[in-house]
Amino acid sequence: MKFRLIIDKNCEEEVVVYSREKTKLTEEIERIVENNAKELVGYIEREAYKIGISEIFCFVAEDNNVYAITENNRFRIKKRLYQLEEVVDDNFIKINQSCIVNVREIKKFDSSFSGVLKVVLKNGYSDYVSRRNIKIIKERLGV
């Protein structure tokens, strides 16, 4: 496969892929492009920031607010978790009533003798998987 990048400040960004058939690679390129195009507005105090969906490690509901957690920041989002579930792609999984994680940002799982499963993300954030979601997560991740 050949790759060609043309930088022209006067053009609108566009990705064109020529392929004989749809493959896992072309699907991955499509997913990356679509996710980078999706953005949310997040707030830190009174300042608003654009956040790409692909930058988000997880969404957490706390104290009647929803937060998007990225590698270095925590943004308040003016949407509910159920609304975010409709916006994000298949790389996000709801692990409990108050947390949706990006599976691409999972560093590891910690399990205890009592059967509790904890997800640890690459940025250090961790949360517990509810018992009813353990089976779903294992199936989705092929564990």
Task: Indicate residue ranges for each PLM-predicted region.
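Long, highly charged amphipathic alpha-helices
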Residues: 24-31, 132, 136
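Long, contiguous, secondary-structure-rich segments that constitute the structural scaffold
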Residues: 12-13, 39, 136
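A broadly conserved detector of short glycine/acidic/proline-rich loop/turn motifs that flank catalytic sites
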Residues: 21, 81, 133
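Conserved residues at beta->alpha junctions
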Residues: 19-20, 71, 97, 131
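Active-site-adjacent beta-strand anchor residues
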Residues: 18-19, 78, 127-130
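Conserved binding/recognition cores within well-folded domains
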Residues: 26-126
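N-terminal regulatory/sensing modules of transcriptional regulators
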Residues: 1-27
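Hydrophobic secondary-structure block in the mid-to-C-terminal portion of proteins
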Residues: 119-143
